Amino acid sequence: MNTSSQGTVRKWGLALLPLALLLADLALLSAQATHPDAAWATLPFKITARLLAIAFALALWFWTQALIGSRKGGPAIGDALHDWTEPWNTHLQSRPKLANAILIVSSAFIDFFGLFLIAAGLFGPTLRPFVGLLVVFVFRQICQALCTLPIPPRMIWRNPGFPSLLVTYGVANDFFISGHTAIAVLGAIEISRLFPWPFGLAAALVAFGEALMVIVLRAHYTLDVLAAIAASFCAATFALHLCAAFGI
């Protein structure tokens, strides 16, 4: 990480202070709601706590906006996680066999999650897992039709020499949103709903690994990954209510 990146990290790190104060204040508000008879839960204390929450949120907003405004624009997409993981990417650039192995393993997990969502919807008590997958797919393809992003420099994306059922190695310009991340996160959500928590935790760790992998390989930008995580939770919630409403 260069000196400029280190300075940026320190400046953004300062934003953790108002964020921590905001979270602490929200915890106080929650405690006031669950202990309404406490001396620190009277109306004046509640109003004060709410005012502080608003103040901390505004401080966080203006501080982070100032940091964003101080950045210099450019023709390329800036990605801090690409910068921070550059040593890992460089390591894989010089070790193609290791990079291929990572591609194979990550694609195998995507095949597993995708087939699980389809099978769970087909043979399980509800069609919800498949509907969630369908919602993510439709949203992603709409984004692909409307948005085109430049290929990240030093991207590692190729056919590793082992077939995959769902991963299309021949397509190398489908960035927003990350299909790897979306399928993995949605799979982890459904596994946590259908199985005991250790299985959900294991699936969540795999999903985290998938997200990290596409960043290190430069197969996606950070914005692709973050949007995919949000889209997966939205799709899972939408599918839950939709299937419950229609009894499917």
Protein language model features and the residues they cover:
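Aromatic-anchored segments of alpha-helical transmembrane domains
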Residues: 24-26, 137-142, 205-215, 233-237
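Alpha-helical transmembrane segments of integral membrane proteins
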Residues: 13-17, 45, 49, 53, ...
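Alpha-helical transmembrane spans of integral membrane proteins, capturing the lipid-embedded, hydrophobic core
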Residues: 19, 50-62, 108, 112, ...
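Membrane-interface loops
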Residues: 68-83, 90, 119-204, 210-211, ...
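Alpha-helical transmembrane segments that form the membrane-embedded catalytic/substrate-binding core
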Residues: 183-184, 210, 220-243
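Multi-pass membrane proteins that catalyze or facilitate reactions on polyprenyl-/lipid-phosphate substrates
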Residues: 5, 9-26
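Membrane-interface helix caps and helix-loop-helix hairpins in membrane proteins
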Residues: 169-173, 215-223
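N-terminal transmembrane-helix/juxtamembrane module of multi-pass inner/ER membrane proteins
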Residues: 2-9, 28-114, 149, 163
